[in-house]
Amino acid sequence: KYIIVQTHTNKDEISREISRVLIEKKLVACVNVYPAASSIFRYNNTIVEENEYLLQAKTTSDKFLDIKTVIEQLHNYETPEIISIAILDGNADYLTWINNEIN
């Protein structure tokens, strides 16, 4: 039921815009933005190393498709990472807070 939705971008302004829109639309309770993620990946048959912003948003699984749509609309990558990670357990008060923020 509770999930973390994760994505990366190489632009600070994109990370902030995605975060703000998701919170404004009450799709997520909060977004943690980590500015120093070092990523190594293949793009157009070339190995690329890039500093990226990691975004982790706390929410519930019923919001995932709407979150995915927002990220796809605002993201600067051709194929952005948009994944869901299950929260198997947690502080009950924190999980209640997530519910209160998105409902």
Regions found by a protein language model. Give the residues of each.
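Positively charged, small/polar-rich N-terminal and surface patches that mediate targeting and assembly
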Residues: K1-N103
